[in-house]
Structures are given as structure tokens and as C-alpha cells.
UniProtKB/Swiss-Prot annotation:
Record gene name: rho
Keyword Disulfide bond part of the UniProt annotation: yes
Topology in the lipid bilayer: Multi-pass membrane protein
Organism this protein belongs to: Mugil cephalus
Cytoplasmic compartment segments: 62-73, 134-152, 225-252, 309-353
Keyword Hydrolase in record: no
Protein name as it appears in the record: Rhodopsin
Amino acid sequence: MNGTEGPYFYIPMVNTTGIVRSPYEYPQYYLVNPAAYAALGAYMFLLILLGFPINFLTLYVTIEHKKLRTPLNYILLNLAVANLFMVFGGFTTTMYTSMHGYFVLGRLGCNLEGFFATLGGEIALWSLVVLAVERWMVVCKPISNFRFGENHAIMGLAFTWVMASACAVPPLVGWSRYIPEGMQCSCGIDYYTRAEGFNNESFVIYMFVCHFLIPLVVVFFCYGRLLCAVKEAAAAQQESETTQRAEREVSRMVVIMVVAFLICWCPYAGVAWYIFTHQGSEFGPLFMTFPAFFAKSSSIYNPMIYICMNKQFRHCMITTLCCGKNPFEEEEGASTTSKTEASSVSSSSVSPA
């Protein structure tokens, strides 16, 4: 084995010289230069500095403006809530531990950080599944006269939390476990060991199949059908141009969210699967650190995509920030009006950009 396994940790370095120490008790500066921990702390501070305001603003603006409280926006708000969980439960913890060079908060802190990071990522994934299914139901109309309403949105929200909890909770109760990973100042699922009594193998397979592959298959199926339906509707002119444009633009926004999710999380999933299937192989601490912390940037991109692609939301946000006035009133107002009109005939009741 090209690593050192101890009680509730695995360090990717063989302890031939006796310098390897528990990541809960000693700085891990023998793994990488101390400057790397300082850089990691600065990166986490940047994510907090950006992630909290933008996600909080998304929640506040939607609550403040009644016209934004549409059923589909409930799912988008769910993403913002999940991101705030990651910011407060994960990013602050990681910033603090990286400043010390090891997981100074102990086992309890590791469990909490790993739980919030996993929960936030899974809520984001299952929210994208709900959005994809909603787009498929609205645009492809497998059920005649289906309208995505408030009850559907609430059921979708409940579904995302149940599924995310089904992935994040088991390691807290003995099916697998959360351990420090990478530079040993953040925690994740134990892909590294076959520790007796934790059934890591079965949990990792369950997680990859049920909480990564199946959601992605559903998303790709829905958007494959959606693209076909949009082309057919455009060719047959079955709906007004306004309705078609509204549906296309909402769908485009959600597709971009899905692509951004894949860009952020696929490297982490790929590295985790490699480590799981090559346990005992040689790899450095940065091998998991880079994809893990790149994935954490997902807390920023969804609200950014929503703000950039939804002119009605952007108009409301500027109005809120400027104390009820929009300095770009003429151009933003015109766009907002047109989009709101498009939304009124759109069966999704969403005002896209």
C-alpha cells in the first residue's frame, strides 16, 4: 500500500520515515508546502466572499418580488439554499482548518464538513433532475395539458432533500464514513480504504449508481427528448413564436446549469472512482485536492447563470440593490416586459431571459 491508514484517516504517503501523523492532531506540512495551505485558505475565503452574497441575494430578491415566486423558481431557490449550506457548513470549516494545516476540528468537525458538502452537492444534482423532468413534461407534453404548479414544485423540493439525505446521512451512521482527503484539511467519503465494519465498497457503488449515474441518465434522456420536441414544434409551428421562444430560453438556461454541474463535478467523481478502483496505488495529496476544491466552486455558478440569463430577475435584483430604482430602467424594463408577456403564454409560467 502506498499510503498510511489509521483510525478514521488515510494519508497518501508511506510512513517509512516516521513523519506521518494523524491529520486530526498534527499539521500536515510534510505533504505539501505550508504556502499551499495558505493558498487553499485564501481560495475558500474567496468562495465565501462570493458564494454567500450571491446566494443570499437570490433568496432575498425572490422573496421580495412577488412576480418571481413562480413554481419553477422554487427549485432554483432550492439550489441557493443548498449552496448556503455548503458555504456555512463546508467552506468556513475548510478555511479554518487549512489555516492550521490539518483538520483541527476533529472527528465531529470532519463529519459535519463532509455531510454539508455531500448534502449540498446532491441537492444541486437532484434539483437539476427535477428541472430536467419539468422541462420534459412542459415542452414534450407526455401528459396532456400538464402545468407545473406549486404542489409539483413542493413535491420536487421534498424529493431533492430526501434523495440528498439518502446519500449524505449513511456515512454518519456507519455505512462508509467521512475522512480527511487530499491535503487533509477537508473531508469526504472514504474511497480510499476497505476499513472493516464500514462496508465502504457497497456504499461507494450505491452512491455512484443511485446518486450520480441514474440522475445523469434521467437528465440526458429528458434533454434528448426536449431537443427533439423543440425542433418538431418549430417545424410544425404548433405554438406561437412567443411561446416557443420562452420555452427555448428557459430550457437553454437549465441546460447550461447542467453543463456547468458536469464541468465542476465530473473531475471529482472521476478521480474518486479511480482511487476506489485502484486502492493502494500511488497518488499524491494534490491528486484529490484539485478536483475536490474545483467542485466547491459550484456554489457560485448557478446563481450567476440565473442572474445572467433571466432579465426579469436581473431587473428585480438591480431594483432591490438600488433602493427601488433601476438606472437601466428603459432597456431592462423593455426586456422584462417582453419576457413577462412570454411567460404568461408559456406553460411553465417562468420568465426566462
